[in-house]
Amino acid sequence: MTEQRGGRRGQLASSELRPGWTTGACATAAARAAYTALLTGQFPDPVPVVLPQGRTPTFALTAEAQGEGWAEAVITKDAGDDPDITHGALVRVRVSAGEPGGGVGFRAGAGVGTITLPGLPLPVGEPAINPMPRTMIIANLRLAAGLDAEAPDPDLLVTVGINDGEQLAAKTLNPRLGIVGG
């Protein structure tokens, strides 16, 4: 039996499901907020984020903190009506100075795993932060700094964490993929 909803066979009308955001989009917003605070001393709230398709949503901050040479922002993930295990999770990003000439580096914070087996799009030993979120984070850090296309990336260390991420990841494929710690 095929249901007809929203004018298309077998598909629900878009108005029936509430859209949400990926963990990567939430991490991007938190990173941009933290870096903006490092640059200006103020956390933007809401935080604008430019997505790869050109959309510019805003994200509300859940928490913020700043210390000598670092800033941290937290976004509560809203996955919409998607049955995402990380819905409601706190996505925490700390931005601090990186290696001179090293561009943007990534570190796994509490609840974000580390890749331990080959076969994923990132090398063994890297934090399990996928290539697209890395690209989005770097692009939004560049926007926050007002860098033009020719300027090198800022030298920053971006540490991404997920509250209770290790427990959440145990319910996913991460352990079978060799991602340990979240």
Q: Would you name each region that the model predicts?
A:
Residues T2-G181:
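Generic N-terminal targeting/processing segments that precede catalytic cores or assembly contacts
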